Amino acid sequence: MAANKGKSQGSLVLHKVIMVGSGGVGKSALTLQFMYDEFVEDYEPTKADSYRKKVVLDGEEVQIDILDTAGQEDYAAIRDNYFRSGEGFLLVFSITEHESFTATAEFREQILRVKSEEDKIPLLVVGNKSDLEERRQVPVDEARGKAEEWGVQYVETSAKTRANVDKVFFDLMREIRAKKMSENKDKNGRKSSKSKKSFKERCCLL
């Protein structure tokens, strides 16, 4: 009998991550660095590119699905559809461009509006291009303060040097996993209380 080589891809837990942020902040560079261990400096923006990879998250084999959305205003109208499909979001700006940091508030509002029925949306604020410290326009304290105000984690990354690239994707997957577990627990709790109620009603009828 052949040894079981682990779960098939179809049966693996899938975590859906959406890359969000202004154009040119390095969303694609972060994605490609995480996926293929390579730094791509010039990348033509498209509506969205989708990537899927099998990874080991805290000892469990899972799949991550990454949707890399374009930051340009031209694509703002179709962004809502992408946001609906996401389970967690990396909200990316460039530490060398304060305008891209300011824009994160608007992107966050859009996410909250689209996911308004959900309680806590897994989201990390990511300050990319940390290798360009001499060109920094966004102080660490300012970015961290905004993230704290929103109740989320702030991490600085460099797609070029790969600093914290794995961290942001894995930390976000952990948040997504925790949310799914909490939701499943709630569902099971509701089912359990319904079955208890149903049992009591049947007992009363006897």
UniProtKB/Swiss-Prot annotation:
Q: Which InterPro entries match?
A: P-loop_NTPase, Small_GTP-bd, Small_GTPase, Small_GTPase_Ras-type
How is it placed in the membrane, per its record?
Lipid-anchor
Q: Name one GO biological process term.
A: receptor internalization
GO CC term (a single one)? plasma membrane
- Annotated residues that bind GTP are located at 21-29, 68-72, 128-131, 158-160
Source superkingdom? Eukaryota
Catalyzes what?
GTP + H2O = GDP + phosphate + H(+)
Renumbered to this chain, motif Effector region spans 43-51
Residues of the propeptide: 204-206
Q: Which cysteines are joined by disulfide bonds?
A: none
EC number(s) from the headed UniProt entry: 3.6.5.2
Q: Could you tell me which residues are lipidated, with the kind given as S-geranylgeranyl cysteine?
A: C203
What the record says about activity regulation is:
Alternates between an inactive form bound to GDP and an active form bound to GTP. Activated by a guanine nucleotide-exchange factor (GEF) and inactivated by a GTPase-activating protein (GAP).
What keywords sit in the KW lines? Apoptosis, Cell cycle, Cell division, Cell membrane, GTP-binding, Hydrolase, Lipoprotein, Membrane, Methylation, Nucleotide-binding, Prenylation
Q: What class of enzyme is it?
A: hydrolase
Q: Where is this region: Disordered?
A: 181-206
Pfam families on file:
Ras
> Which Gene Ontology molecular function entries are recorded, alphabetically?
ATPase binding; G protein activity; GDP binding; GTP binding; GTPase activity; ubiquitin protein ligase binding
Instruction: Write down which residues bear the modification named Cysteine methyl ester.
Output: C203
Primary subcellular site in the record, as a coarse category: membrane
Q: Can you say where in the cell this protein is located? A: Cell membrane; Midbody
Signal peptide coordinates: none
Tell me how this protein assembles: Interacts with EXOC2/Sec5 and EXOC8/Exo84. Interacts (via effector domain) with RALBP1.
Q: What does this protein do?
A: Multifunctional GTPase involved in a variety of cellular processes including gene expression, cell migration, cell proliferation, oncogenic transformation and membrane trafficking. Accomplishes its multiple functions by interacting with distinct downstream effectors. Acts as a GTP sensor for GTP-dependent exocytosis of dense core vesicles. Required both to stabilize the assembly of the exocyst complex and to localize functional exocyst complexes to the leading edge of migrating cells. Required for suppression of apoptosis.
Family listed: Belongs to the small GTPase superfamily. Ras family.
Q: In its UniProt entry, what is this protein called?
A: Ras-related protein Ral-B
